[in-house]
């Protein structure tokens, strides 16, 4: 078996720690990504070779109305209610993404816990019933367009070229409100993939 990478995810702490003072977040980034050694020969960091970026669904803007009690399990969203994108969102996560690139991380993976709240069946970033995808039936194409727009923006504007995208994170789970998330059954996965 060949291991493709040694990775970690920015969910959920990076949205906050990426906004900390520069010396603190740079130290954290060194601990995560650095391949260098200190003068005594000890490693500066664990040298992750891949970094996973959580594309938030927008539950943070809903606050307690999101149905997600823990603010650390909510995410900002790039898609706005008027259909525009605010690429300034998820600033803490974007900082760690750039820090990973600057420190030589070789692979980047984007993943989605929930489609944007503007596209979900219940206007929330979690499932009500845990039985089916929390994506409106008429939003499958829009969801694909959203993901494509995300990838193009990060490549064209930030020079981050994601190697992989995971549009369905842990689809077998119910995701009924502990954090952003959506279940997907096999037919829904197939339909979304065909789009």
Predicted regions mapped to residue ranges:
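N-terminal catalytic cores of secreted or lumenal carbohydrate-active enzymes
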Residues: 1-163, 167, 175-177, 182-190, ...
């Amino acid at each position: 078996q060949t291991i493709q990478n040694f990775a970690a995810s920015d969910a959920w702490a990076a949205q906050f720690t990426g906004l900390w003072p520069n010396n603190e977040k740079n130290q954290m980034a060194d601990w995560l990504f650095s391949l260098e050694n200190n003068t005594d020969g000890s490693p500066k960091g664990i040298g992750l070779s891949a970094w996973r970026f959580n594309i938030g669904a927008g539950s943070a803007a809903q606050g307690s109305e999101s149905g997600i009690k823990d603010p650390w399990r909510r995410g900002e969203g790039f898609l706005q209610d008027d259909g525009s994108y605010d690429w300034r969102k998820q600033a803490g996560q974007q900082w760690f993404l750039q820090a990973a690139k600057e420190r030589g991380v070789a692979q980047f993976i984007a993943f989605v816990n929930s489609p944007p709240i503007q596209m979900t069946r219940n206007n929330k970033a979690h499932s009500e019933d845990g039985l089916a995808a929390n994506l409106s039936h008429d939003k499958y194409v829009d969801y694909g367009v959203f993901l494509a727009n995300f990838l193009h923006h990060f490549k064209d504007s930030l020079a981050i070229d994601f190697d992989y995208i995971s549009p369905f994170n842990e689809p077998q789970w119910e995701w009924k409100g502990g954090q952003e998330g959506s279940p997907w059954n096999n037919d829904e996965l197939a339909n979304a993939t065909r789009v």
